[in-house]
């Protein structure tokens, strides 16, 4: 229902307009206060890069963060990552992730990013505290990438990158809750890069698509072509589950059942194992896998995806960030 409201297919969005006006007024006032320096943002001693969204829902932001961290690491840059840690609840903040940190403590995305990149990752509702925690333990870190947080103006930033869904784009264009917008589309004029996941990019936007890898068994780590798996049940607890199901079909998989779950939904063995019958194979997203690995069964697999950016702009962006991190 919410997708139909935000896309404008359902007329119910009009009933929510008063709340959207209030949301827009408050969010605009907050940004203006920082812009006019009525409120002070904390500036880190190293450059900060924000990777965020203008809309609610999954746009492919986390794969972009992983891509960015890995690309900078390949250039010899030491990167730290901070996040709010949505869906997690730590005993205290800031929380610096370790191999023992669970998604219940830190949230799905931070654990995934930590496992994929081996970069220092810290979470806190106050992102500046997360930055301080990383720099205290890893003083050699040269640049901080913040996963989400475009609207978290308490943390000063040097570069802003926005990821948008190239198919859904901005829906009906209204602020939450009548539409999907956290900020209006005009905000794109002030950011440093716009990355478009799928669809047809517009002038000045960086094209991106998600490239699926081999399926990975949660228990054994065995890899295989996902099309070789039979009697597949697909599960996705991400911001936009249909994208994952479409990716599977693109890989030649016709799931017997597709199970969309809420983003950041807690998972346990009983609930997940109930999704598959004898002889069926469960295929999930990598984001779900970080929550299920501890209690996985032998017929559970996940499909990792990597962000692939096209054109000349990604190289220019990476050169800019490398120069910033190197102090040039």
From Swiss-Prot:
It comes from the Bacteria. The keyword ATP-binding applies. It holds the Pfam family LpxK. GO terms for molecular function: ATP binding; tetraacyldisaccharide 4'-kinase activity. Keywords: ATP-binding, Kinase, Lipid A biosynthesis, Lipid biosynthesis, Lipid metabolism, Nucleotide-binding, Transferase. It is an enzyme of class 2 (transferase). This is Tetraacyldisaccharide 4'-kinase. The lineage of its organism: Bacteria, Pseudomonadati, Pseudomonadota, Gammaproteobacteria, Enterobacterales. The gene is lpxK.
């Amino acid at each position: 229902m919410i997708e139909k409201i935000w896309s404008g297919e359902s007329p119910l969005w009009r009933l929510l307009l008063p709340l959207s006006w209030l949301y827009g007024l408050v969010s605009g006032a907050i940004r203006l206060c920082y812009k006019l320096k009525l409120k002070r943002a904390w500036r880190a001693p190293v450059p900060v890069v924000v990777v965020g969204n203008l809309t609610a829902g999954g746009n492919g932001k986390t794969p972009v963060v992983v891509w960015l961290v890995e690309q900078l690491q390949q250039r010899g840059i030491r990167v730290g990552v901070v996040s709010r840690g949505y869906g997690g609840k730590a005993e205290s903040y800031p929380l610096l992730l370790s191999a023992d940190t669970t998604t219940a403590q830190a949230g799905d995305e931070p654990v995934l990013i930590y496992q994929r990149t081996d970069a220092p990752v810290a979470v806190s509702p106050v992102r500046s505290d997360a930055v301080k925690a990383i720099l205290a333990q890893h003083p050699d870190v040269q640049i901080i990438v913040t996963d989400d947080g475009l609207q978290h103006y308490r943390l000063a930033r040097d570069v802003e990158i926005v990821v948008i869904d190239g198919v859904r784009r901005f829906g009906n264009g209204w602020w939450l809750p009548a539409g999907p917008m956290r900020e209006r589309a005009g905000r794109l004029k002030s950011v440093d890069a716009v990355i478009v996941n799928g669809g047809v990019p517009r002038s000045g936007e960086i094209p991106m698509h998600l490239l699926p890898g081999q399926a990975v068994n949660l228990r054994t780590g065995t890899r295989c072509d996902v099309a070789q798996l039979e009697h597949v049940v697909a599960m996705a607890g991400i911001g936009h589950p249909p994208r994952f199901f479409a990716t599977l079909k693109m890989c030649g998989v016709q799931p017997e059942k597709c199970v969309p779950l809420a983003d950041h939904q807690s998972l346990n063995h009983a609930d997940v194992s109930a999704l598959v019958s004898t002889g069926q194979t469960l295929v999930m997203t990598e984001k779900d896998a970080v929550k299920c690995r501890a209690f996985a069964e032998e017929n559970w697999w996940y499909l990792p995806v990597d962000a692939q950016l096209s054109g000349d702009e990604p190289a220019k962006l990476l050169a800019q960030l490398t120069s910033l991190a190197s102090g040039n």
